[in-house]
Amino acid sequence: PMVSCGNALIVSPDAGGVPRARSLAKDLSLDIAIIDKRRDKANESDAMNVIGKVEGKQCIIVDDLVDTGGTLIKGAEALLKEGAEEVRAYITHGVLSNGGMERINSSSMGGLTITDSIPQYDHQKVKVLSVSKLFAEAIRRVHHDESISVLF
């Protein structure tokens, strides 16, 4: 299921992802929130602080990579704790190592959408979108000295 844009909010999972989230939010005319991860003391777990108003919103986390899913899930939990209606993530590369798929499936997240840039399969809460045609067209255009900018 997709989210309703009227009630949606784009979320950057960290400070480094703000430009990506801001660009998407601008394209979709949506607001943005940021998850600020802080470690208070050595050997303590990270604290997730939400910057922005997420109460009653369908939060869309956007990022380039998810590995084990631990940080993503902690971020989603922080958003829900702040009153988010639902949290979904759209991430380009889904490594999902060391039990990441199971971790996502048992989490409080509404779902995760990834591409098949790393081979994965649809699962309970995980949807995989194919980028094979996009990659094939980019390769064809490069081979024929054509612009690839129209693809992105």
Residue ranges of each PLM-predicted region?
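PRPP-associated nucleotide enzymes
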Residues: P1-F152
